[in-house]
Regions:
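Post-Walker A helix-loop "phosphate-sensing" segment adjacent to the P-loop in P-loop NTPases
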Residues: 10-20
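ATP-dependent small-molecule kinase phosphotransfer cores
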Residues: 21-82, 89
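Conserved phosphate-donor/acceptor-positioning beta-strand/loop module used by diverse small-molecule
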Residues: 82-87, 96-120
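NTP-dependent small-molecule kinase module
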Residues: 100, 116, 120-124, 138-174
Length: 174
């Protein structure tokens, strides 16, 4: 899925940076502060929101998630491209504040293919799978608000397409 595409791009291009999200949920086994997430208390998170410290934020399943603004701006200032691997609600918040950002929607080849990928992970219950599929179908309704879409039916092609989009954006005249 999206995460695999992002990992491939990061591995192949040292000038691309992945933003690290903040969350109020507890760390899972193997997750590292500042690498997997920035882990915060509810109070810290709400304070940061009030101070304009996030590009986007949302409450999901009783926990807050968001993209801290300062690290992203620092990477952009250093001349790097920054990837935000976020849901459509987050993307729409970012687009409102930064309409010149480049928004790429990664589409599954089909709902059946998406179901199969989620099931293949073996980490989610049937109920969770149904919730994820419903969310994915709702997210597809936002496709028209994105600049590009890439169908992830072949991983190498999808990675190549995203790289080409990123390159084309650098070559734009206006």
């Amino acid at each position: 899925g999206k995460g695999t595409i992002v990992k491939r791009i990061l591995k192949s291009d040292g000038k691309v940076h992945l933003s690290v999200s903040a969350t109020t949920r507890n760390p899972r086994e193997g997750e590292e502060e500042g690498v997997s997430y920035y882990f915060m208390s509810d109070e810290q998170f709400v304070k940061a929101v009030g101070e304009g410290g996030f590009l986007e934020h949302a409450s999901v399943h009783g926990h807050y998630y968001g993209t801290p603004k300062a690290p992203v701006m620092s990477q952009l200032k250093a001349g790097r491209d920054v990837i935000l691997e976020i849901d459509v609600q987050g993307a729409m918040q970012v687009k409102e504040s930064y309409p010149d950002g480049v928004f790429i929607f990664i589409l599954p080849p089909s709902v059946d293919a998406l179901r199969s990928r989620i099931m293949h992970r073996g980490t989610e219950s049937e109920e969770d799978i149904q919730v994820r599929l419903g969310a994915a179908q709702r997210e597809m309704e936002y496709l028209e608000h994105y600049d590009y879409y890439v169908v992830n039916d072949d991983l190498e092609k999808a990675v190549d397409s995203v790289k080409k989009i990123m390159a084309a954006e650098h070559w734009k005249v206006t």
